[in-house]
Amino acid sequence: MKRVNSCVKSDEHVLEELETEGERQLKSLLQHQLDTSVSIEECMSKKESFAPGTMYKPFGKEAAGTMTLSQFQTLHEKDQETASLRELGLNETEILIWKSHVSGEKKTKLRATPEAIQNRLQDIEERISERQRILCLPQRFAKSKQLTRREMEIEKSLFQGADRHSFLKALYYQDEPQKKNKGDPMNNLESFYQEMIMKKRLEEFQLMRGEPFASHSLVSATSVGDSGTAESPSLLQDKGKQAAQGKGPSLHVANVIDFSPEQCWTGPKKLTQPIEFVPEDEIQRNRLSEEEIRKIPMFSSYNPGEPNKVLYLKNLSPRVTERDLVSLFARFQEKKGPPIQFRMMTGRMRGQAFITFPNKEIAWQALHLVNGYKLHGKILVIEFGKNKKQRSNLQATSLISCATGSTTEISGS
């Protein structure tokens, strides 16, 4: 029987012995214990440091039982918040004080003086702010060195072809964000570019003045400054000719003013998309006369009122927008006159609007054409706006008529 030699021959390759982290730590402890060259001063200078004790509170006990998803998410968020406060080194009492301070709860039991509680809260806030500051600091790996971009390029050129990749991995550079100078004109480059484009378009519209327009669309834009007046005149073709042909003139400026739910002016809106005019023959086919409007029970006492330059629109559909009003009334915009103002009401006055024309003659023409038009399924009812004097006279007249009626009833009885 042959004997098997288990010895490794000298010419065979010996595998490299791998050392684990645990073995390395044990070896360093053994060397530290067997080292006799240390002095008493070195031993006394070393201080014992222990890791602080932590509290483990299982999350399963609080989450046990039946609960909804929102309740579980709320409970989980509270648990994470408590864990983050424990990481700051706060004890249970300080955590309870901070939570009651954040939630605004006031306990009726005996507590410490307000000054002591305020000092504790201030200390907790300082810890939280310090932790946030540390987390915001730029982080880097251990045994690494930060270089500038130029220094990094030099290192790469020097070690090109050398076997020092591990050393290069320890070097890094970080691009710092460029700080913008407030006085730098390059910061306003985008806004300047937009202004130049708009100026070029204005010049193109001015060149087209007096020529037949290629498109039947309406381009409505608001150029209202802080004073509420338009900066540029409107560009309109003759409204009578093109409206009769069913073509929409091209409007350049039209004020579109919206009101917030508190009925306060929030500034002008800009309509820059093409808007087509509603042809006049279509308006005439889909509108009611004043007699037909009075047959509706809601508007049985309909009266347009005394003519003036403000039109009051009511019974508007919720789907009506400024674009719809512009497509109906912008045909009355004069070529060199002031722009027509559109005011849409919201909140309690939703479904109503005011349109201001340059004069009452144009307003009367607009009312005569558009009144009773069926817009988005509802009849558009238009009246002339009433000023404060007309309102007071109307209220006085109604009070007198009511008093006369009551007197007649008493005398008749």
Curated annotation (Swiss-Prot):
Gene3D superfamilies: 3.30.70.330. The keyword Phosphoprotein applies. Residues 223-235 have a biased composition (Polar residues). The modification Phosphoserine is found at S232. One of its GO terms (cellular component) is U12-type spliceosomal complex. It holds the Pfam family RRM_1. GO terms for molecular function: pre-mRNA intronic binding; U12 snRNA binding. Residues 223-247 are annotated as: Disordered. One of its GO terms (biological process) is mRNA splicing, via spliceosome. Keywords: Phosphoprotein, RNA-binding. Transmembrane segments: none annotated. InterPro entries: Nucleotide-bd_a/b_plait_sf, RBD_domain_sf, RBM41/RNPC3, RRM_dom. May bind RNA. This is RNA-binding protein 41. It comes from Homo sapiens.
